[in-house]
Amino acid sequence: MTTTRVAVVEKILSANDRLAEQNRARLDGAGVLSLNIMASPGAGKTSTILRTIEALRPRLRIGVVEGDTAAVTIDADKVIAAGMPAVQINTGGDCHLDAVMLANALPQLPLDQIDLLIVENVGNLICPAAFTLGTHFNVLIASVAEGDDKPYKYPGIYRGIDALIINKIDLLPYVEFDMNYFRRGVEMLNPGVITFPMSCRTGEGVTEWAQWLAEKVKSEK
């Protein structure tokens, strides 16, 4: 990478970070705790969000921002059908959301009626790690069906997360996934990161995840 290109990239990221700070200030001002959910395609981002809504609906008011590369509203429609407000962001092919996109989405949500905002980033294990959004927590969903080597192959995204969901654990008897090997990789990159083994299909582990979230929202109020 040339010196000129490095300077341009740094300028873009710096501008993004400044706007991310404004997003955080806006969310803080509204008393909204926010999550940036990242994962590869098919890991279960939307399923996790729907399970979270189901578990926390009696206690928390939840809003969702859905990010997709194509002009579709499939996931946002599911959230709305579950009774929660949602905004769809179509990136036009970009492999990640950025602070500008979230800044444009926030005015479309009733922030004064939301306790927890969940942002579903574009399915990708590289690009989303580089662009801060201004959310309070970064959460990664890793599906056991993806294999146990992902922390070793995509270290950047694992280093920057605040919580890790290991999804689809109901498939462990049927796939080659060494949990100890996977956890060693995670621990090497992000020592002590809180981890939630979960199955969105069976509901196993959802209660623990939802309780952690509820406590985080309460502590921010």
Q: Where do the model's predicted regions map?
A:
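Conserved C-terminal guanine-recognition region of P-loop GTPase G domains, centered on the G4
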Residues: 128-135, 144-192
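Canonical P-loop GTPase G-domain recognition
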Residues: 171-220
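Active-site glycine-centered loops adjacent to acidic/histidine catalytic or metal-binding residues
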Residues: 68, 167, 199
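Nucleotide-state-sensitive switch-loop elements of NTP-binding domains
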Residues: 3-25, 29-38, 43, 47, ...
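Residues at the C-termini of beta-strands that transition into short coil/loop
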Residues: 90, 142, 199
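Residues at alpha-helix caps and immediate loop-helix transition turns in enzyme cores, especially N-
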Residues: 48, 98, 150-153, 178, ...
